[in-house]
Regions:
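Glycine- and acidic-residue-biased ligand/ion/polar-headgroup-sensing regions
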Residues: 95-96, 108-110, 114-132
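A short beta-loop-beta micro-motif enriched in histidine and acidic residues
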Residues: 79-88, 99-116
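A short, N-terminal "cap"/entry segment at the start of jelly-roll beta-barrel domains
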Residues: 1-87
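Short, conserved active-site entrance elements at the starts or edges of catalytic domains
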Residues: 91
Length: 132
């Protein structure tokens, strides 16, 4: 995906979040120059837990049919150390017609809250010891 496409997606998502009164932390709007001015050690948890923006087409080239824009606000370490949180908080923007592949977590808890007013279809399955 070209940087210009990423920038346009971020802009559209920012407008969508604003319309629905979703407030993001200040680092959501940091410029590359601002990031370079920061002390990396002071922001290590953010880097380690991959907080911030994620725009994905899940390995494909069809973002507008199988894609997702999300902002991770809170996350924990899989092992529980050094960040013992079992809860992830992510704000997602799924566009009309987009689907996201299924996945699961052994140790994470997720709440799914539809703030945008669209139809949200979720299919749930139990997994076995072989992750099937």
């Amino acid at each position: 995906m070209k940087r210009s496409e990423v920038n346009q997606i971020l802009k559209q998502t920012g407008h969508f979040f604003a319309r629905h009164h979703i407030q993001l932390p200040p680092f959501a709007r940091f410029t590359p120059q601002r990031w370079q001015q920061l002390d990396p050690k002071a922001w290590q948890e953010l880097f380690d837990l991959k907080l911030g923006w994620d725009i994905t087409a899940f390995g494909g080239n069809h973002f507008f049919t199988q894609g997702l824009t999300l902002f991770t606000l809170r996350n924990g370490s899989v092992s529980g150390t050094p960040y013992p949180k079992c809860y992830a908080e992510k704000i997602m923007h799924v566009r009309e017609g987009q689907v996201t592949p299924m996945h699961f977590h052994w140790r994470k808890q997720e709440d799914i809250i539809n703030r945008g007013g669209g139809n949200l279809i979720v299919e749930l399955w139990n997994s076995d010891a072989f992750e099937q």
